[in-house]
Amino acid sequence: MVNDVLREAESRMKKATEALRNHLATIRTGRASPALVEHLHVEAYGATLPLNQLATITVPEPRMLVIQPFDANTVKAISKAIMNSELGITPTDDGRLIRLAIPQLTEARRKELTKLVRARVEESKVALRNIRREALEDLRDLEHEKMISEDEHRRAQEKLQELTDRYVRELDHIGATKEAEVMEI
């Protein structure tokens, strides 16, 4: 029972950490990365599809993304989706390939992105604390129902705190890495 509560908490913490990683991957740095655009939604074939289902995205140079649609008829729709996104990048297309030149970030934009990274990390920490609180409530319920002893409850609380601390350190590391990436010129 205690192990089930701890396993569930760890699983949810892992998901929160992955969600942060995925979200931070979409934040633009001075470097080109397919993660910047792969989840953009494109109106094609009468539906809205993620870009990575319509094209291959490559990085031929550190500041260049090349998008090669599987179907040349989707080039205009993909360009439109990129223009409508908040990336601030203008696509150039030759009818079959789309090139995205990633401009250098200004100092003000870097600081703005750093604040955004910190805010996302803090939101994830709040999510971890909420997961911990819910797990603590579950453990308390088990103790009140006499399914576990007070000692087992205390040991489980300590394990849960260690788990939370480990994931908070991981979130801090992910955030620091992304901040360094954003501030890199």
UniProtKB/Swiss-Prot annotation:
It is found in: Cytoplasm. GO terms for molecular function: ribosomal large subunit binding. The keyword Cytoplasm applies. Keywords: Cytoplasm, Protein biosynthesis. Pfam families: RRF (PF01765). SUPFAM superfamilies: Ribosome recycling factor, RRF (SSF55194). One of its GO terms (cellular component) is cytoplasm. Its main location: cytoplasm. Gene3D superfamilies: 3.30.1360.40, Ribosome-recycling factor (1.10.132.20). CDD domains: RRF. Responsible for the release of ribosomes from messenger RNA at the termination of protein biosynthesis. May increase the efficiency of translation by recycling ribosomes from one round of translation to another. Belongs to the RRF family. This is Ribosome-recycling factor.
